[in-house]
Every structure is written in structure tokens, then in C-alpha cells.
Amino acid sequence: MFYSHCLVSRKGPLGAIWVAAYFFKKLKKSQVKATHIPSSVDQILQKELDALTYRVLAYLLLGVVRIYSKKVDFLFDDCNKALIGVKEFVAKERNREKTGVSLPASIECFSIALPERFELDAFDLGVLEDFHGGNVKPHEDITLKDGSQETERMDMYSMERFDMEEDLLFTFHETFSTNHNENKHESFAHDMELDAENVRDTTEEASVRVVEAEPLDSNEPSRDHQNASRHREDPESDDILLEPQMSEDIRIAQEEDTVRETICTIVQRLVDSHESSGDNLHRDGHTENLESEKTSKKTSCEEMQHDRSLPSECGIPEAIHGIEDQPSGATRINGEKEIPEMSTLEKPEPVSVTGSRDLQEGVEKCRDHNEAEMADFELFHGSHKEQSETSEVNLHGSEKGFLSDMTVSKDPSSEFNATDTPVTVTPKTPSRLKISEGGTSPQFSIIPTPAAKESSRVSRKRKCLIDDEVIIPNKVMKEMIEDSSKLLAKRRNVPHTDCPERRTKRFANPFRSFLEPLIQYGSSDLQSLFCQPIKLKNWATTGTPKDTKIARHKEKSSLDTVRSPGVILSSDQTENTQEIMETPQAAALAGLKVTAGNSNVVSVEMGASSTTSGTAHQTENAAETPVKPSVIAPETPVRTSEQTVIAPETPVVSEQVEIAPETPVRESMSKRFFKDPGTCYKKSRPASPFTSFEEHPSVYYVENRDLDTILMNDEQVNADERQDLQQETWSSRTRNVAKFLEKTFLEQREREEEEKVSLLQLCRGRTQKESARLFYETLVLKTKGYVEVKQNHPYSDVFLMRVSRPQKAC
């Protein structure tokens, strides 16, 4: 595998491309701007093409494309921002045009054309002589009443003044450059004076300061004024205005250093001492000039020449040297001349030095032209504005030594040319004047750019204020953590027996409490006593017919030995016969086998289990092994464990206490067997729960039994009967349902119908809970083999049928 520092290095030339290809989300804007796509592609193609596979080149191409797309996005965003800014600026200009003062029609012919390249040397700055300042408005119409002073400082060039001065400077540059070796001697004869006039036009959007020089000699001011006037009327004639004395001044080059020191000294003195007095002096001079013009043309020209003369020590070449002083305002010396200060000049501005001309002719032309022009002069920081009927440009003899110093320099870049004049041009509204391509506008203006908008406020996240009242102290928190008392719950005392439950039910149902025994649990000796069968001897056949009738009645009544608690014996039975009364405890806990006579033995097997002792059933052995009968004397009680023959009129009494007639027998303690009122009328259970129902069909016959009673009552099993449930297979509800089905099958057999019961008919009209119980008991019986379940089709009716052969449920 190859290794290339150009590709692998993060800071290499292709580092940003790899980042864009693999981790585009981590690409930064600085990386996008710093990536040069052509050079990156050249490096990939020229240096690493042979060593790279197409797969690597594909990723490099992907990175290049992504960087290029990001560059396009950045450019698109910048263009949108610029377009939005231009639209907002144009909208503001339109609103200002609607609300501002309308301009006269004469101003529409002037506009600004912006060439592709600003070549100031090629500009043709001509002067329109037929334009007489028709765009000048009164000061009140163009000035806001509550406007600030900064707005007043922005003035506009006058058309004639700007063009005249530019041509004058350009002409002097040409003449001075050709004859720079001839003039230098008379540089100390005159001093410099800088004069600036700030003329405001209707838009009041820019200001330009013009630097002018005035001579010291009192003999030459008339000649300089004449040259200035000629320049306003005919700028092209400046090419032939050349002073013959300049050839001698230029020759003295060795005095260059002395001139510079003198100029610096004069500038420093003027700035320190005459900065504050210029406003009043200029105002006095201007007022004096206006009064002199009203007298006569000639007198006004002479006063203008005389007022603008300065002594030699007041020359100010500070603007020529590019010294940057007060941003606005002017200074005057001795109440005669004002010396304005330029904002920023990197190159000196030469002033044409002309000889004496026809003064009267130049002054008249200058006055005729300026009578129609209204100019506003900005005085000292732009705070004082006055209207003047005339505006003049006074050009006097300049410091020849300084001019020679400026032109003697061998550095060609230091020579003055038209490009050194700082002129700011800003596009405004589109011009109505159609100018051909490459042409220039006769007017240049400084248009203030729109004020910078306030940047959007950076959103800061709010500090989260903490509520001291909600804070939980550390001490409380420690106590809550260490204390686990609230997590512990007291355990409820669970009773070991069901006595509290029985007591609660007893008070809830007081009518049933009379049927329950006072002693809930019996003795184990009594329970074992009743487990043995009772055998009764049949009456003698040799008795009277009445005795025979009584014997048959005993045989019949032996089947109903177990009585319900509410059954009361009749008087005939108590007189004629003696029955063996059995307590409910014996009926529930033991199996009875009663023998009547020597041959006929009717056994009634009672299936019950011991609830406390847990003894096994002994009824099956007792039924299979008969006891040998013995003869008992009259009036002798017979034990239940022996089979005896009882003499007539001798009652057979068991070991239990005989109950008198019409005495109700208490309910059995077995809650499971006698749990509902319906069980009081049923017969005893079989001795064994596994006995087939076909062996003793009459035992399961229930009179007036309803299936609703079976299903409505909840089955309750106490703690004493849990052992019986483990030994037995069927619950009481299962037995009751089996009895109900047995009864139904017997009735169908008697009617000679098919022994079949529909489960849908049994569940019809019952609740969901009862239907579920019935279905469950049906499944239990089906599992034990008592019934047979049949369903012909899915989701169809289920039929319960009796099994064809006897089976023991196991």
C-alpha cells in the first residue's frame, strides 16, 4: 500500500477535500474558502494519479464537488444580501424623492457616468457656459429644522467651480513639468495662502475643499486675480500662461532644505495662534466684499484683490505637504484672508502662477457669470452658512521655491498628476441624461453612503434562577435517607383458624346462626364411635297384622334414616314404631348399616370423611362383613356394632342420646356438605367418592333441586376440609352438578328419550360466571369418565351424554 503525505496529511493541500468527502458535516467555512479548486485538481492529476485507484479518486472527486457546491452556496448568499441591500437603498431613495423638494428641469441634463476604470487623466472636464446655477434652492427649503450639524457638512461641488479648478491644476501641471528646470529663484518672494470655498447644491450631500495659493507681494495680486478670472471663462488658455520668472526660480535647487524648514515653521505658527479667530474675520471680509460689489464693478474687483492679499509670513503650504489638520473650518490672519484646511491630501496641489493680464476684462467676465449663482459657504466646522451672490476663485502667485522643490524630485511617482486629486464618486439614482459609453460626466459629487444598520441583538440565555424556598437542606435529606421507618409496614395478624370468619358471618346473617352448633369441633372419640354401622333386627313375622304393618313401615323408613334439621317426626310414627334417630354428626362422619330381620338387610352407606382426626373410612369393610345376629331381651338397648333381634315393643336405641319428637336436629359441623339451604333436603353422600352412580341411583335423586342454586353459591373450603379435598376427587359443586345430570338422565329414560343434554340450553339465561362454572364442572366430569361430551361441528352445540358402561372415576 502506498503512502502519500499529500493525501493523508490533514494540513496538506488535499486535507479539506478529504474532510469534505468523508466528514462533510465537519467541514468549516474557512476550509472551503481556503481551498483553491483548480490547484487541488492539478495536484490530484499530476502527482498522485498513477498511485491512486479509481475508488480513492472517486472520493477525491466527491470532496472537490462538495467544496465547489459550498462555494456556490456562499456566493449565492452574498449576492442575495447585496441585492437586498440595493433594493432597500433604492426604496429609501424613492421615498426621499417623493417626500423631498422637486428639482428644476435644468438639473436633469446632468448625471454621473461611472466608467469601468477610473482614469482621471483621460477625463474631459469641460464647463457648460450656458448653465447658470438654476438648481440652487433657498437655505430653508433644503435644510431640516431639527437636522444635526453632521448633515450640514456634506456639500456638493458647484459645476463651474469644480471644473475650473481641475482644468487649472491640470494645465499648471503640464506647464510646470516642462519648465521645472527654469523656475526656482523667486520662491522666497511670496508666501502661500490656502483658500477653500464650500458650495452647497440642492442635494447637500458632499463637500469638497479647494486649496488655493495667494502671493505676498502687493504688486502682483491684480495679475493673479486676472489669471483666475480668465481661467473660469476659458480654461484651455492656461497652457500659455507661464511666468517668465519661473525659469530663474527653478535653477536654485540648493535652497530646497531651507524652504521646507520655513514652510513647516509657518504652518505650526498659523495652526496654534490663528485657529479661533478665522470665523469673525472671514465674515467681516465677506461683508466688505458684498458692499464693494454694490458700488461698482471696478471698485469691487479692487477690493477683492486688496482683501485677499497676505503678508509674506502668513503663507500656508500645509495642505500642499499633505498635513492633516482640522477637519473643517478656516483660519484668517490679520482680518484679511482666510486659510481653509483640507481633510486628507497625499500629494500637493500645484496652483497655476500667471503673469499680469487684463484685470478689468477678467473681472467683468467673472462677475457676469457669478451673478446668477447662489453659493453657500461653510464656515468653521459647518456651523455658519451664508448665501453669497458671487463665488470666485482667487489664484495668486505661489511659493516658487516650494514648487521647484516639488518638481526637482527624481522620483517619477512623486510628480503631480490628475490622478492624485482625491475625488469620491458614488452612484446615485439612474440618470435621465443618456451618455455614450466611455463618456464622462461634467459633474462629480460626493454622495454619502447610507448609515450602517444596527446589528441584530445577540440572544442570550436566561440565567436559571434558583428558588431558595424549594431547596431541601442537606440535613433533612440525610435524615430521610437514613430513616427507613416509612418504608416498613406492620404485618396484620392472620388467624390460625376460621373462628373469626365464622363469627363475622354469624353476626352478618343472624337467622342462620341458630342452625349452627355451639361447639364448632367435636371430639375424636365421638367421631370414631359414629363411624361403625348400626344393624337393626327385623320384627318377628308371627306378630299381629298391626306389627307386620309396622315392620314394613320400618323397612321403608330405613332408607330415610338421615333427616334434615327442619323435619319433625309425626305422632303415628312415634306411637307405632321406634325409629333410629341419628344426629347430623353421625350422618356426616360415619356410615350406617341397618339390618331389619334375619334375611332382609338394607344398607345405607354414608360417605363422609373425618374433619379433625383424619381417620380412614371403614364403611366398606362393614358392608362386606355381616355381623352375626344375637337375641336381646326386651327393654335392652342394642349397640350399634352388634346385630341384634329386637322384641316387639322394644325400641332400638343406639349409644347416642335419643332425641324426643318434634326436636330439631342441629346442622352438621361439616360446612362443605351443609353449606347452603338446598343441602338440607338432599340425601347423604355415598360412603366412597369413587362409587359409580349406577350402583345407587336413588341416592343421587334430589327433590326440587335447581341448577341455579348450585351455580350461584360460591364454594367455600375451610382449613379442616383441605385434607378431605386431597383424598377426595370431587368437590361439592361437582357432586351437585353430577346429581343434576343424573336426575335429568333418569327423567329422559323414563320418558324413553335419548339420554342427551345440550350445554347451550343449560347455559341459556345464565350469567357469564355461572356458565363458566357449569362448563368447568362438565370438563371435570368428562375427565373422570362420568359423562361423554360430543360436538359435531366447530363452534356448534355441545351435548352431554351418559357413558354406556359403568366406570369408576379415578
UniProtKB/Swiss-Prot annotation:
Q: What is this protein called?
A: Sister chromatid cohesion 1 protein 2
Gene3D superfamilies documented for this protein:
Structural maintenance of chromosome 1. Chain E (1.10.10.580)
In the record, which residues are listed under signal peptide? none
- Composition-biased stretches, type Basic and acidic residues, lie in 220-234, 273-310
Q: Which family does it belong to?
A: Belongs to the rad21 family.
Question: What InterPro entries does the entry give?
Answer: Rad21/Rec8-like, Rad21/Rec8_C_eu, Rad21_Rec8_N, ScpA-like_C, WH_DNA-bd_sf
Compositionally biased spans, kind Polar residues: 606-622
Compartment(s) of residence: Nucleus
Subunit field text: Component of the cohesin complex.
Native source species? Arabidopsis thaliana (Mouse-ear cress)
GO CC list = cohesin complex; nucleus
Q: Where is this region: Disordered?
A: 200-244, 273-315, 606-626
Question: What keyword terms does UniProt attach to this protein?
Answer: Cell cycle, Cell division, Chromosome partition, Mitosis, Nucleus
List the expressing tissues. Answer: Low expression in shoots, buds, siliques, leaves and roots. Found in, but not limited to, actively dividing cells: in procambium, protoderm and ground meristem in roots, and in shoot and floral meristems.
Cite a single GO BP annotation.
double-strand break repair
According to its UniProt entry, the function of this protein is described as:
May be involved in sister chromatid cohesion during mitosis.
